[in-house]
Amino acid sequence: MINNYFFAILLQDKISKNWAIGLILISICLAILLIVSIFVIKKIKQKNQHNRAISFSIDTNKSNDKRFWISFSLICCYLTCFVLSVAFLIIGIIALI
């Protein structure tokens, strides 16, 4: 029911342009956030490697498993952000037309 209401609002002429511009701005913000987070994580990894510390892990017997799950969760976050950004951009462009 919420989805039908959302798309009904998007299809109205006066409100659709405001929603479309809002969705496009949200997609741009998500893309910028994604790019910034990639650079921040790379800088943190470089700093940890420079200090000869193991990046993104705690000293335990299963540090490789923890590193794998942290990398896996980061990749999932990147993909989710990318998919949301593209979806909002497409919905915004469709609403503008």
Swiss-Prot record:
This is Uncharacterized protein MCAP_0234.1. The lineage of its organism: Bacteria, Bacillati, Mycoplasmatota, Mollicutes, Mycoplasmataceae.
